[in-house]
Swiss-Prot record:
Autophosphorylated on tyrosine residues between pH 7.9 and pH 10.5. This is Insulin receptor-related protein. It comes from Mus musculus (Mouse). SUPFAM superfamilies: Fibronectin type III (SSF49265), Growth factor receptor domain (SSF57184), L domain-like (SSF52058), Protein kinase-like (PK-like) (SSF56112). Residues 1273-1300 are annotated as: Disordered. Highly expressed in the islets as well as in pancreatic beta-cells. Belongs to the protein kinase superfamily. Tyr protein kinase family. Insulin receptor subfamily. Probable tetramer of 2 alpha and 2 beta chains linked by disulfide bonds. The alpha chains contribute to the formation of the ligand-binding domain, while the beta chains carry the kinase domain. InterPro entries: FN3_dom, FN3_sf, Furin-like_Cys-rich_dom, Furin_repeat, Growth_fac_rcpt_cys_sf, Ig-like_fold, Kinase-like_dom_sf, Prot_kinase_dom. The extracellular domain is required for sensing alterations in external pH. One of its GO terms (biological process) is protein autophosphorylation. Residues 944-1300 are cytoplasmic. Its EC number is 2.7.10.1. The keyword NAD does not apply.
Length: 1300
């Protein structure tokens, strides 16, 4: 590998070492940084050499590109965890921000990722030229709509396992100009080439920064000159084989030296550096809190590992005997939320008092047990009050002692007051809780039965310490049925969505004590429900309840109807009597039934979910779906119905020789790539089965990881900022947008009532699983497939409604072949008719035919024949053919694409002499008469031409024509006093151009911003007349895409021409300003493909207007197109910018200046300028747009360009150029002028890609253009003229003829 290729990134390495002073000796370590909202927050990175932890830069919505200019942190070389960028507006590249970032270690990852770039709306390239290693973790680059230069990065040079990277949803590669330095003739050596993912290419981060590739053994770093560094260096070094000269260390760093292991007396910290025991003892994970760091097995850890603890003042971790004790000093701690318990995690000994006041919350018990479950001792008191969210105190599962060093009100060690939903005390009784001093107090706990409290008295040894008032039987358990009688259900009836119940009458001792009944019910798939389901009292996982009034008659049995319920669902149900206790000393009594389990009847299922389809052959479709959300029974089978759909007959109406066609594709869903091979159908006879790698077990894991990442990332965003979530989008299986409207009409009706499909039989099948293989289908045909879910009760309740999908089988390879041979028949002088048969069973519809014919010794010509044209004669009529021997072959184009060519057929066109040997005598007789007639016609034509040319506008550059008549003021004259000059805009070919204001120029406007073109004060009278005459040419033009003339000031000096103001200047300057390295870059993104096509359409529209006006431009180039404030491109300046770009012109043989790099070959050879030559120039303008205004034919002198083009040369194809634009250039650069398209034809090809506003203001859609095109079309009766490229006849508008 050539060493010079290292220099582009070697400069960055040298800058990195210089910015770090003496290498690793001056490292400044910063903790994890979360930088958000304000760009100024980035200043926290100012002195950081290493971010020990993660670096997150996110949520800067108000930032602009200007905010990041001049902002750079060259000292930063390492991030030990991960680097995350998310929604930072205005940031276009990281190359200036982190020019020397060398290593991302990935010690801790963001769910497996070390580098995450997510939803960065303005980022154009990653731009980390110094990055040499991502030691652990994958890379995730996703949803960055402007991000390019991803295909030029070899991630294998940075990561040990790049296969898990996730790089999706960024700018399409074909829309990016991913060109590396030195590749397109730029100065210096090109970047190194490597092979990654099976593709060998140049490797770079940006168009000016190569990716560093060291010539050393894999994994070793190197110096800027290519010498190998020490094996412990990572990312680069300043001296070879010196562990003190590394940019970063491969393993460990200590006192400026890179080492494989820490020296004796030091300990590894954060997997990258060594620290002493003293430094480890002073480290703090959270500033301000006591250190918990310990040394374990040669590493300094934030906490001792599980089962180990620090003993006394020692920093070393020792193994615990049993549960590791952890003492937590809390004073008096009030716990009013789960978060308040987090600092008690792992505590076994709480020194102080705990007060629980949990008024609200959901599902608290698991979190409380996780945080408080290890507490064994509370030295003070435990007070639980107003905790309405608590149902049980079982989360204190290890609590053994409440010592009572301090007590509530001086008396109470355990104080439980006003907990409306507390029902159980948990495992305190069985665990043997001890309260050595003080009393216990229970009051206003209406659901806590007294027997639980009395048991606690016995266990804790507090019986007899407290009075009856301190455990009040009237306020504890008064709303719980602590002593109950059993109720029995006497009747039940189940239906699909309801259950009817009746139970026996209940009569308490006092009839007035019975108030009502409450029926509790809930879904219970298993028969394991308990009365106390759900860990809290806030409704989570709790029972549904229904209040039932007492029956009016005492002899009537109470009952209830539970509705609405889900079909075929098991419910747990019990009923409880609500009673009062009126007797003074009697315990609260009640009645309750046992829990019974009832199942509702089945019903029809809901529709199957997520149906997808693919085709693996021309006769098979594979369909897969998911079960219905509500099965409403046991699914026994699925009913699958399918029907062939008729092709859209309207396709025959269009002429696809002149109109583009978006072909439908056979159905394929990438989700099928993960399915099992059992779904694969038998291959077609004569075809080899495709070889697939056996599905590995890693795919489900990767899929699960993907789901987990998305969830975790959304959780992170939820905590970062509240962002409204977009509604779910409904996506269609259909891959063919042209058929959307038709498909929606079909979907509106039922399958069996399809209007256009009644001729095709509906077929059906029953399948037991969520998949089906449909066989015996017609090739490349669309089918509608309906799936119904049927359960075990389908015979009574029916199957589900249908879910459906449209799918198309694959094409048959030979179906579009033309049967038999092509026949021919002479059809008169210089003409022949070719006949052939249509394919009997094509792939869909036959839309057109292509005939490739050639005369012996000449290039082949391709003629396109629409199906309608073919149908008239069963072939095609070729006319105006020169005499000679010909060969021809035909192929058909169907909905699936092109078929195969037929065998060639030969025919001949006879010479006139062969047809009529007596023709020579007639010729000799009439020649003198014909000669005199031709002389007369030539004379008349000469005088007519002189008269016609007096109104023909051709060239507009001063060197192209001579001055004639003096200028006469007319209605375009504007008084000089109405004009005010504001500032200079630049130099034109006649003089300075100014920005100004014109008063009263347009109706309703007080003043109008204008461009003012002037002529030099020293200009001659001839030059002033030329200046005004050139402006007069534009008086006849009125087109939105041609710069408008607004007026002339010819009286007095200086002479002024008033033009429409184009604030963004000429197109060439505008394109060059969009280059990333441009000093005058306005902060706009580089043009996307849609922007390029819009520019091309606007220029073509202006040129089509000029062609319709019989105007030949002769100098079409980006420099002569202007850009308005809203980025509309217009034909303008008409040669007035020539002096500004004088190097674009060349003086040939003492003649005027010529723009040879934009000129057609016929213009260079013979001086012929027509609309066809303007089309050639238009192709060069397209090339300028794609390359951001590079000079055409770079590396060739003007003389060389002249010879190159005249010898048949054209500009080379651009790498990464969009295919659509490359095809347009190829059409424009046909060496035969008649083979080039007209500007209207160009617009025909791209009209569907232009913005809707184009239709409102363009010449192309104007009635004038439509009338002009109609007058140029040949009639159906005319014979076929010699075809141009792609079969389109030459319909170019009449031009002004040759220019000189």
């Amino acid at each position: 590998m050539a060493v010079p290729a290292l220099w582009p990134w070697g400069v960055h390495l040298l800058m990195s070492l210089l910015s770090l002073g003496s290498g690793l000796d001056t490292l400044e370590v910063c903790p994890s940084l979360d930088i958000r909202s304000e760009v100024t927050e980035l200043r926290r990175l100012e002195n950081c050499s290493v971010v020990e932890g993660h670096l997150q830069i996110l949520l800067m919505f108000a930032a602009t590109g200007e905010d990041f200019r001049g902002l750079s942190f060259p000292r930063l070389t390492q991030v030990t965890d991960y680097l995350l960028l998310f929604r930072v507006y205005g940031l276009e590249s990281l190359r200036d921000l982190f020019p020397n970032l060398t290593v991302i270690r990935g010690t801790r990852l963001f769910l497996g990722y070390a580098l995450i770039i997510f939803e960065m709306p303005h980022l154009r390239d990653v731009g980390l030229p110094s990055l040499g290693a991502v030691l652990r973790g994958a890379v995730r680059v996703e949803k960055n709509q402007e991000l390019c230069h991803l295909s030029t990065i070899d991630w294998g040079l940075l990561q040990p396992a790049p296969g898990t990277n996730h790089i999706v949803g960024n700018k399409l590669g074909e829309e990016c100009a991913d060109v590396c330095p030195g590749v397109l003739g730029a100065a210096g050596e090109p970047c190194s080439r490597t092979t990654f993912s099976g593709r060998t290419d140049y490797r770079c981060w940006t168009s000016s920064h190569c990716q560093k590739v060291c010539p050393c053994p894999r994994g070793m770093a190197c110096t800027a000159g290519g010498d190998c560094c020490h094996s412990e260096c990572l990312g680069g070094c300043s001296q070879p084989e010196d562990p003190r000269a590394c940019v970063a260390c491969r393993h460990l760093y200590f006192q400026g030296v890179c080492l494989r292991a820490c020296p004796p007396g030091t300990y590894q910290y954060e997997s990258w550096r060594c620290v002493t025991a003293e430094l480890c003892a002073h480290l703090r994970e959270v500033p301000g809190l006591a250190t918990t760091f310990g040394i374990y097995e040669g590493s300094c850890l934030a906490q001792c590992p599980p089962g180990f603890t620090r003993n006394g003042s020692s920093i070393f971790c020792h193994k615990c005997e049993g549960l590791c004790p952890k003492e937590c000093k809390v004073g008096t701690k009030t716990i009013d939320s789960v978060q308040a318990t987090q600092d008690l995690v792992g505590c076994t000994h709480v020194e102080g008092n705990l007060i629980l006041n949990l008024r609200q919350g959901y599902n608290l018990e698991p979190e409380l047990q996780r945080n408080l479950g290890l507490v064994e001792t509370i030295t003070g008191f435990l007070k639980i009050k107003h905790s309405f969210a608590l149902v049980t105190l079982g989360f204190f599962k290890n609590l053994k002692l409440i010592r009572g060093d301090s007590m509530v009100d001086g008396n109470y060690t355990l104080y439980v007051l006003d907990n409306q939903n507390l029902q159980q005390l948990g495992s305190w009784v069985t665990a043997g809780l001890t309260i050595p001093v003080g009393k216990i107090y229970f009051a206003f706990n209406p659901r806590l039965c007294l027997e639980h409290i009395y048991q606690l008295e016995e266990v804790t040894g507090t019986r007899g310490r407290q009075s009856k008032a301190e455990i009040n039987p009237r306020t504890n358990g008064d709303r719980a049925a602590c002593q109950t009688r059993t109720l029995r259900f006497v009747f039940n009836l189940t239906e699909e969505d309801r259950i009817l119940l009746r139970w026996e009458r209940y009569e308490p001792l006092e009839a007035r004590d019975l108030l009502s009944f409450i029926v509790y019910y809930k879904e219970s798939p298993f028969q394991n429900a308990t009365e106390h389901v759900g860990p809290d009292a806030c409704g989570t996982q709790s029972w549904n309840l229904l209040d039932v009034e007492l029956p009016l008659s005492r002899t009537q049995e109470p009952g209830v109807t539970l509705a609405p319920l889900k079909p075929w669902t098991q419910y747990a149900v019990f009923v409880r009597a609500i009673t009062l206790t009126t007797a003074e000393d009697s315990p609260h009594q009640g009645a309750q039934s046992p829990i019974v389990y009832l199942r509702t009847l089945p019903a029809a299922p809901t529709v199957p979910q997520d149906v997808i389809s693919t085709s693996n052959s021309s006769s098979h479709l594979l369909v897969r779906w998911k079960p219905p959300v509500q099965r409403n029974g046991n699914i026994t089978y699925y009913l699958v119905l399918w029907q062939r759909l008729a092709e859209d007959g309207d396709l025959y109406i269009n002429d696809y020789c002149h109109r583009g066609l978006r072909l439908p594709t056979s159905s394929h869903d990438t989700r099928f790539d993960r399915e099992d091979p059992a779904l694969e159908a038998e291959p077609e006879q004569g075809c080899c089965p495709c070889q697939h790698s056996p599905p590995g077990q890693a795919l489900p894991a990767l899929e699960a990881q993907e789901v987990t990442f998305q969830k975790k990332f959304e959780n992170f965003l939820h905590h970062a900022i509240t962002i409204p979530k977009a509604p779910w989008k409904v996506t269609s299986i259909n891959k063919n947008p042209q058929r959307d409207s038709e498909r929606h009409r079909r979907e509106a009706g039922l399958l069996r009532l399809g209007k256009n499909n009644s001729d095709f039989e509906i077929q059906e099948d029953k399948v037991p699983r969520e998949r089906a293989i449909l066989s015996g289908l017609r090739h490349f045909t669309e089918y509608r497939i309906d799936i119904h879910a049927c359960n075990h009760a389908a015979h009574t309740v029916g199957c589900s409604a249908a879910t459906f999908v449209f799918a198309r089988t694959m094409p048959h390879r030979e179906a579009d072949g033309i049967p038999g041979k092509v026949a021919w028949k002479a059809a008169g002088k210089s003409s022949v008719t070719l006949h052939w048969l249509e394919p009997p069973d094509p792939n869909g519809l036959i839309l057109k035919y292509e005939i490739k014919y050639r005369r012996l010794g000449e290039e082949a010509t391709v003629l396109c024949v629409s199906r309608l044209r073919y149908a008239k004669v069963g072939g095609v009529h070729l006319a105006l053919l020169p005499p000679g021997n010909y060969s021809a072959k035909v192929r058909a184009t169907s909905l699936a694409g092109n078929g195969s060519w037929t065998d060639g057929v030969t025919f001949y066109i006879t010479d006139l002499e062969e047809e009529d040997t007596g023709g020579m005598r007639i010729f000799l007789t009439v020649t003198p008469v014909g000669f005199m007639l031709l002389v007369t016609l030539a004379a008349l034509g000469f005088f007519y031409s002189r008269k016609r040319n007096s109104t023909l506008y051709t060239s507009v550059n001063p060197e192209y024509f001579s001055a004639s008549h003096m200028y006469v003021p007319d209605e375009w004259e504007v008084p000089r006093e109405q004009i005010a000059i504001i500032r200079e805009l630049g130099q034109g070919s006649f003089g300075m151009v100014y920005e100004g204001l014109a008063r009263g120029l347009e109706a309703g406007e007080e003043s109008t911003p204008v461009a003012l073109k002037t002529v030099n004060e020293l200009a001659s009278a001839r030059e002033r007349v030329e200046f005004l005459k050139e402006a007069s040419v534009m008086k006849a033009f009125k087109c939105h895409h041609v710069v408008r003339l607004l007026g002339v000031v010819s009286q007095g000096q200086p002479t002024l021409v008033i033009m429409e103001l184009m604030t963004r200047g000429d197109l060439k300057s505008h394109l060059r300003s969009l280059r990333p390295e441009a000093e005058n870059n306005p902060g706009l993104p580089q043009p996307a493909l849609s922007d390029m096509i819009q520019m091309a359409g606007e220029i073509a529209d202006g040129m089509a207007y000029l062609a319709a006006k019989k105007f030949v431009h002769r100098d079409l180039a980006a420099r002569n197109c202007m850009v308005s404030q809203d980025f509309t491109v217009k034909i303008g300046d008409f040669g007035m910018t020539r002096d500004v770009y004088e190097t674009d012109y060349y003086r040939k043989g003492g003649k005027g200046l010529l723009p040879v790099r934009w000129m057609a070959p016929e213009s260079l050879k013979d001086g012929i300028f027509t609309t066809h030559s303007d089309v050639w120039s238009f192709g060069v303008v397209l090339w300028e747009i794609v390359t951001l205004a590079e000079q055409p034919y770079q590396g060739l002198s003007n003389e060389q360009v002249l010879k190159f083009v005249m010898d048949g040369g054209v500009l080379e194809e651009l790498e990464n150029c969009p295919i659509q634009l490359q095809e347009l250039m190829r059409l424009c650069w046909q060496h035969s002028p008649r083979l080039r398209p007209t500007f209207v034809h160009i617009l025909d090809r791209i009209q569907d890609e232009l913005r809707p506003s184009f239709r409102l203001c363009s010449f192309y859609y104007s009635p004038e253009c439509q009338r002009g095109q109609a007058s140029l079309l040949p009639t159906e009766a005319e014979p076929d003229s010699p075809p141009t490229l792609n079969g389109a006849s030459d319909y170019s508008a009449p031009n002004g003829g040759p220019g000189h």
